A protein has these predicted regions:
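Sec-dependent N-terminal signal peptides
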Residues: 7-13
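N-terminus-centered regions that define maturation/targeting leaders and the start
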Residues: 2-7, 22-225
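C-terminal motif of bacterial Sec signal peptides marking the signal peptidase cleavage site
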Residues: 17-21
Length: 225
Protein backbone atom coordinates (compact mmCIF):
# COMPACT_ATOMS: atom_id res chain seq x y z
CA UNK A 1 0.00 0.00 0.00
CA UNK A 2 2.81 2.40 0.87
CA UNK A 3 4.54 1.66 -2.44
CA UNK A 4 1.35 2.40 -4.38
CA UNK A 5 0.96 5.70 -2.54
CA UNK A 6 4.52 6.74 -3.45
CA UNK A 7 3.96 5.97 -7.14
CA UNK A 8 0.73 7.97 -7.22
CA UNK A 9 2.45 10.90 -5.52
CA UNK A 10 5.30 10.85 -8.02
CA UNK A 11 2.91 10.83 -10.99
CA UNK A 12 0.95 13.69 -9.45
CA UNK A 13 4.17 15.69 -9.02
CA UNK A 14 5.14 15.21 -12.65
CA UNK A 15 1.65 16.22 -13.80
CA UNK A 16 1.76 19.35 -11.62
CA UNK A 17 5.15 20.33 -13.07
CA UNK A 18 3.83 19.98 -16.63
CA UNK A 19 0.70 21.99 -15.87
CA UNK A 20 2.74 24.68 -14.11
CA UNK A 21 5.10 24.96 -17.07
CA UNK A 22 2.20 25.35 -19.48
CA UNK A 23 0.49 27.94 -17.30
CA UNK A 24 3.59 30.19 -17.32
CA UNK A 25 4.00 29.96 -21.11
CA UNK A 26 7.21 27.91 -20.93
CA UNK A 27 7.71 25.52 -23.85
CA UNK A 28 10.52 23.24 -24.83
CA UNK A 29 12.86 24.76 -27.45
CA UNK A 30 12.60 23.19 -30.89
CA UNK A 31 15.83 21.71 -32.22
CA UNK A 32 17.74 24.13 -34.47
CA UNK A 33 17.28 23.47 -38.17
CA UNK A 34 20.41 22.32 -39.96
CA UNK A 35 21.62 24.68 -42.69
CA UNK A 36 22.47 22.89 -45.90
CA UNK A 37 24.80 23.93 -48.69
CA UNK A 38 21.71 24.67 -50.78
CA UNK A 39 20.44 27.06 -48.11
CA UNK A 40 23.77 28.90 -48.05
CA UNK A 41 23.78 29.22 -51.84
CA UNK A 42 20.22 30.55 -51.79
CA UNK A 43 21.25 33.26 -49.33
CA UNK A 44 24.19 34.38 -51.53
CA UNK A 45 22.25 36.94 -53.53
CA UNK A 46 24.25 39.52 -55.46
CA UNK A 47 22.86 42.98 -54.78
CA UNK A 48 23.84 46.11 -56.71
CA UNK A 49 25.48 48.45 -54.25
CA UNK A 50 24.88 52.15 -53.70
CA UNK A 51 26.63 54.96 -55.53
CA UNK A 52 30.15 54.95 -54.00
CA UNK A 53 30.15 58.76 -54.05
CA UNK A 54 26.83 59.00 -52.22
CA UNK A 55 28.56 59.11 -48.84
CA UNK A 56 30.94 61.94 -49.78
CA UNK A 57 30.17 65.65 -49.45
CA UNK A 58 27.85 66.82 -52.22
CA UNK A 59 29.59 68.74 -55.01
CA UNK A 60 28.35 70.13 -58.36
CA UNK A 61 28.42 68.00 -61.49
CA UNK A 62 29.59 68.91 -64.99
CA UNK A 63 29.38 67.42 -68.47
CA UNK A 64 31.22 64.17 -69.25
CA UNK A 65 30.86 62.45 -72.63
CA UNK A 66 32.54 59.60 -74.47
CA UNK A 67 32.81 58.36 -78.04
CA UNK A 68 33.40 54.79 -76.88
CA UNK A 69 31.14 54.18 -73.86
CA UNK A 70 27.58 55.28 -73.10
CA UNK A 71 26.06 56.15 -69.77
CA UNK A 72 23.63 53.40 -68.72
CA UNK A 73 24.97 50.89 -71.27
CA UNK A 74 27.40 47.96 -70.80
CA UNK A 75 31.10 48.43 -71.44
CA UNK A 76 32.00 47.47 -75.03
CA UNK A 77 34.23 44.42 -75.48
CA UNK A 78 37.27 46.65 -76.16
CA UNK A 79 36.91 48.15 -72.68
CA UNK A 80 36.72 44.72 -70.99
CA UNK A 81 39.79 42.93 -69.71
CA UNK A 82 41.60 40.22 -71.61
CA UNK A 83 44.27 40.50 -68.92
CA UNK A 84 41.73 39.37 -66.32
CA UNK A 85 40.42 36.61 -68.56
CA UNK A 86 37.47 38.12 -70.46
CA UNK A 87 37.38 36.49 -73.94
CA UNK A 88 37.99 39.19 -76.55
CA UNK A 89 38.71 41.87 -73.94
CA UNK A 90 41.29 44.41 -75.09
CA UNK A 91 41.89 46.61 -72.01
CA UNK A 92 41.56 49.82 -74.04
CA UNK A 93 40.68 52.86 -71.95
CA UNK A 94 37.68 54.83 -73.24
CA UNK A 95 37.77 58.20 -74.96
CA UNK A 96 36.55 60.91 -72.58
CA UNK A 97 35.69 64.61 -72.94
CA UNK A 98 34.49 67.00 -70.25
CA UNK A 99 33.33 70.60 -69.91
CA UNK A 100 31.41 72.94 -67.62
CA UNK A 101 33.61 72.42 -64.56
CA UNK A 102 34.15 75.22 -62.00
CA UNK A 103 36.56 78.06 -62.80
CA UNK A 104 38.43 77.22 -59.59
CA UNK A 105 39.53 73.86 -61.04
CA UNK A 106 43.31 73.40 -61.09
CA UNK A 107 43.60 69.70 -61.93
CA UNK A 108 41.59 66.54 -62.63
CA UNK A 109 41.57 62.90 -61.58
CA UNK A 110 40.13 60.28 -63.95
CA UNK A 111 39.13 56.87 -62.64
CA UNK A 112 37.10 53.73 -63.26
CA UNK A 113 35.80 51.88 -60.22
CA UNK A 114 33.66 48.77 -59.69
CA UNK A 115 31.93 48.85 -56.27
CA UNK A 116 30.40 45.39 -56.82
CA UNK A 117 33.71 43.55 -57.31
CA UNK A 118 33.79 40.51 -54.97
CA UNK A 119 36.55 41.90 -52.76
CA UNK A 120 34.73 43.62 -49.92
CA UNK A 121 36.31 46.91 -51.04
CA UNK A 122 35.47 47.20 -54.74
CA UNK A 123 38.09 47.34 -57.51
CA UNK A 124 39.95 50.31 -59.00
CA UNK A 125 40.43 49.53 -62.71
CA UNK A 126 42.02 52.82 -63.70
CA UNK A 127 43.26 55.91 -61.89
CA UNK A 128 44.98 58.92 -63.48
CA UNK A 129 46.05 61.81 -61.23
CA UNK A 130 47.41 65.34 -61.72
CA UNK A 131 45.78 66.01 -65.09
CA UNK A 132 46.19 69.78 -65.65
CA UNK A 133 43.08 71.96 -65.78
CA UNK A 134 43.86 72.90 -69.39
CA UNK A 135 43.16 69.30 -70.45
CA UNK A 136 39.52 68.57 -71.28
CA UNK A 137 39.75 65.19 -73.00
CA UNK A 138 41.67 61.92 -73.18
CA UNK A 139 41.85 59.81 -76.35
CA UNK A 140 40.91 56.14 -76.38
CA UNK A 141 43.88 54.03 -75.37
CA UNK A 142 45.45 56.68 -73.15
CA UNK A 143 45.59 54.12 -70.35
CA UNK A 144 48.38 51.97 -71.79
CA UNK A 145 51.57 51.57 -69.69
CA UNK A 146 53.92 54.52 -70.16
CA UNK A 147 51.25 56.34 -72.16
CA UNK A 148 52.39 59.29 -74.27
CA UNK A 149 48.76 60.42 -74.56
CA UNK A 150 48.64 61.71 -70.99
CA UNK A 151 49.52 65.40 -70.55
CA UNK A 152 52.42 66.23 -68.24
CA UNK A 153 52.54 65.93 -65.24
CA UNK A 154 49.67 63.39 -65.21
CA UNK A 155 50.47 59.83 -64.16
CA UNK A 156 48.67 56.52 -63.69
CA UNK A 157 48.38 54.80 -60.32
CA UNK A 158 48.88 51.06 -59.98
CA UNK A 159 45.21 50.39 -59.32
CA UNK A 160 44.00 47.16 -57.74
CA UNK A 161 45.53 45.00 -60.48
CA UNK A 162 48.98 46.23 -59.44
CA UNK A 163 49.86 47.85 -62.77
CA UNK A 164 49.95 51.56 -63.74
CA UNK A 165 47.51 51.22 -66.62
CA UNK A 166 43.86 50.77 -67.58
CA UNK A 167 42.52 47.33 -66.70
CA UNK A 168 39.18 46.65 -68.35
CA UNK A 169 36.01 45.48 -66.68
CA UNK A 170 35.84 41.81 -65.76
CA UNK A 171 32.59 40.91 -63.97
CA UNK A 172 32.86 37.31 -62.69
CA UNK A 173 30.35 34.85 -64.15
CA UNK A 174 27.23 34.59 -62.01
CA UNK A 175 28.01 37.73 -60.01
CA UNK A 176 25.20 39.83 -61.46
CA UNK A 177 25.44 43.37 -62.76
CA UNK A 178 28.51 45.47 -61.98
CA UNK A 179 28.18 49.26 -62.21
CA UNK A 180 31.44 50.61 -63.60
CA UNK A 181 31.83 54.24 -62.50
CA UNK A 182 33.95 56.23 -64.96
CA UNK A 183 34.58 59.50 -63.16
CA UNK A 184 36.33 62.81 -63.72
CA UNK A 185 36.96 64.68 -60.47
CA UNK A 186 37.82 68.38 -60.49
CA UNK A 187 40.22 69.60 -57.78
CA UNK A 188 41.16 73.05 -56.49
CA UNK A 189 44.85 72.06 -56.25
CA UNK A 190 47.32 71.43 -59.11
CA UNK A 191 48.63 68.18 -57.62
CA UNK A 192 46.91 65.34 -55.76
CA UNK A 193 49.78 64.83 -53.33
CA UNK A 194 50.13 61.08 -53.92
CA UNK A 195 52.55 58.94 -55.92
CA UNK A 196 51.95 56.15 -58.43
CA UNK A 197 52.25 53.56 -55.66
CA UNK A 198 49.19 54.95 -53.82
CA UNK A 199 45.94 53.00 -53.81
CA UNK A 200 42.77 54.39 -55.29
CA UNK A 201 41.35 54.57 -51.77
CA UNK A 202 44.29 56.63 -50.51
CA UNK A 203 43.98 58.98 -53.47
CA UNK A 204 40.27 59.38 -52.79
CA UNK A 205 40.92 60.16 -49.14
CA UNK A 206 43.61 62.70 -50.06
CA UNK A 207 41.62 64.58 -52.68
CA UNK A 208 38.27 64.61 -50.87
CA UNK A 209 38.76 68.04 -49.21
CA UNK A 210 39.94 69.47 -52.54
CA UNK A 211 37.09 68.17 -54.70
CA UNK A 212 35.05 70.99 -56.25
CA UNK A 213 33.01 69.00 -58.79
CA UNK A 214 32.54 65.49 -60.13
CA UNK A 215 31.15 63.98 -63.35
CA UNK A 216 30.38 60.30 -63.85
CA UNK A 217 29.33 57.82 -66.52
CA UNK A 218 27.91 54.54 -65.18
CA UNK A 219 28.22 51.42 -67.34
CA UNK A 220 26.23 48.47 -65.89
CA UNK A 221 27.89 45.30 -67.15
CA UNK A 222 27.58 41.59 -66.44
CA UNK A 223 29.56 38.58 -67.63
CA UNK A 224 28.78 37.58 -71.20
CA UNK A 225 27.25 40.89 -72.29
Amino acid sequence: MKRTTLIVAAVAGITLAIVTGCSTGTTAAAPAARQTATDVAAEHVFVRGPDPYEFLPRVPSFTLTSQTVRNGRPLPIAQLSGILGVPGGKDISPQLSWSGFPATTKSFVVSMYDPQAPTGSGFWHWVVADIPATTTSLPAGAGVPGSSSLPSPAFQLNGDAGAPRYIGGAPPKGSGVHDYYITVTALDVPASGVTASASGALLGFTIDPHTVARATLICPTSAGQ
